[in-house]
Amino acid sequence: MSKNVILKADNLYKSYTTGKESFEALRGVSLSLEQGEMLAVMGSSGSGKSTLLHILGAMDAADKGEIRLNGELREDYGTEPAATKIRAEQIGFIFQDFNLIQDLTVEENVALPLMLAGENNRVIWDKTDQMLEKVGILEKKKNAITELSGGQRQRVSIARALITEPKLLLADEPTGNLDYNTSIEIMQLFLELQQEQDHSIIIVTHDAMVAGYTDRILFLHDGQVCDEYRCRKNGDDMDHIVDKFKTLSLKKGR
């Protein structure tokens, strides 16, 4: 039996205008994500992958198209005040540059979404400890962000994304600033969240190793889905994923 579709996007378009120039970032992109599925979005620079993730994360609004979240058509998706509520309650977003507040401790960064929501202190700090333990960094909770390695900072970012208990996680190049071994550790953490907590995850990446951890890969080129690949998740298809990405890069250079 197939699982419930947690997120479905149909025929998304997005354009940006700079001066007299207009640029189509997305041209009719459609996708669906099942509960407990992990999906990678790959594409060369300028393919529209980050724009797509920001729209799916209710951080921007599409010009045209439909988005259904948990089966509900949301015509207000990406527009305020609905977008803030969607982000706060249903989506966890993880950034490449971690997006942490340097003046706060580890635990304060993780607790911030609950503080802003007006949760009571006991719930805030109990859940903060739970999330930090889940990502394997509880012993660093009193540390300053500046005292952490890149991998540790990304774990803090993931814990913060989890604190409101969203079922949907969106990650924009989550290993982009990490070395190879640390990237593997972070992807294994995502895999644990998927398999043990039934999280649905979309990861934008240019890294074939990262994409190989997911269930499916959508390849974007020039604002459109140009290919889709279902991963074996055993490492045997890494060369195939790399070849597909190289093909997109060659198209970009023409």
Name each region found by the language model.
Residues 169-172:
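Catalytic Walker B motif of ABC-type/P-loop ATPase nucleotide-binding domains
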Residues 20, 74-92, 238-239:
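ABC ATPase NBD coupling module
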Residues 104-112:
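Short coil-to-helix segment of the ABC ATPase nucleotide-binding domain corresponding to the Q-loop/switch region
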